[in-house]
């Protein structure tokens, strides 16, 4: 042994404003969702980067048969990550569902769709070149579900999510509990805003972080 002291690894600590408690995750039960307030459209789609750290739990009533997606599945404005029938899928522009052919590995993963660099990755599972098509419509990016003809939802634990436009961080979502009414949702560190449930039911709060 060299006798050296062990190297300390710094951990970024996220401090939320007074009245909020940081959570490890929040969980939906197929009815809850969050509208991020960010739209994909013809002017920005090729600059967007969408990062979702989550565990997809499935059991969908409203999302359609085995479609478990975060983002937009609106015709002409596909921009999503997720899975269908046990296979990883993504959509990046236009109206084409992109089948990776890679089987889903259960558990927590970070999904990243980076249109600017034409990359789609799922942590520890896949890293591929993304097919990017033109966007001809406008649609909101959704968490715990996806925009379609209506909003479709599914069961999921979400640990964090970020949206970039080019090098600009537009949203940085952290799971939290809003006091005093103990409302679980996401706090955006960029806008300093709380995002509560836009659907039915209520999010399940994970343990305090």
Predicted regions and their residues:
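Extracellular, beta-strand-rich glycan-interacting domains
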Residues: 3-5, 51-56, 151-180
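Flexible glycan-contacting loops in extracellular carbohydrate-active proteins
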Residues: 128-157
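Short, aromatic/His-centered strand-loop micro-motif at the edge of beta-sheets
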Residues: 88-110
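Surface-exposed loop/edge segments in extracytoplasmic proteins
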Residues: 21, 76-77, 95-100, 125-130, ...
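Extracellular glycan-recognition modules
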Residues: 17-89, 165-170
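Beta-strand-rich interaction surfaces with strong enrichment in secreted/lumenal proteins
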Residues: 36-38, 98-103, 131-132
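Enriched but not universal
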Residues: 1-21, 190-209
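Localized edge beta-strand/strand-to-loop motifs within extracellular or lumenal beta-rich domains
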Residues: 103-123, 166
């Amino acid at each position: 042994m060299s006798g050296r002291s062990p190297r300390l690894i710094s951990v970024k600590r996220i401090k939320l404003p007074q009245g909020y408690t940081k959570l490890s995750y929040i969980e939906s039960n197929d009815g809850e969702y969050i509208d991020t307030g960010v739209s994909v459209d013809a002017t920005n789609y090729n600059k967007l980067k969408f990062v979702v750290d989550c565990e997809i739990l499935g059991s969908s009533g409203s999302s359609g048969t085995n479609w478990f997606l975060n983002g937009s599945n609106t015709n002409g404005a596909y921009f999503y990550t997720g899975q269908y029938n046990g296979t990883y899928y993504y959509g990046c522009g236009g109206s084409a569902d992109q089948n990776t052919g890679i089987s889903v590995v259960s558990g927590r993963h970070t999904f990243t769709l980076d249109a600017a660099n034409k990359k789609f990755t799922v942590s520890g599972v896949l890293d591929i070149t993304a097919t990017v098509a033109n966007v001809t419509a406008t649609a909101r990016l959704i968490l715990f579900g996806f925009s379609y003809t209506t909003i479709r939802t599914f069961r999921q634990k979400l640990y964090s999510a970020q949206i970039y436009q080019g090098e600009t961080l537009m949203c940085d979502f952290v799971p939290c509990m809003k006091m005093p009414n103990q409302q679980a949702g996401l706090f955006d560190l960029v806008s300093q805003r709380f995002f509560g449930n836009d659907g039915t039911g209520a999010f399940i709060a994970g343990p305090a972080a």
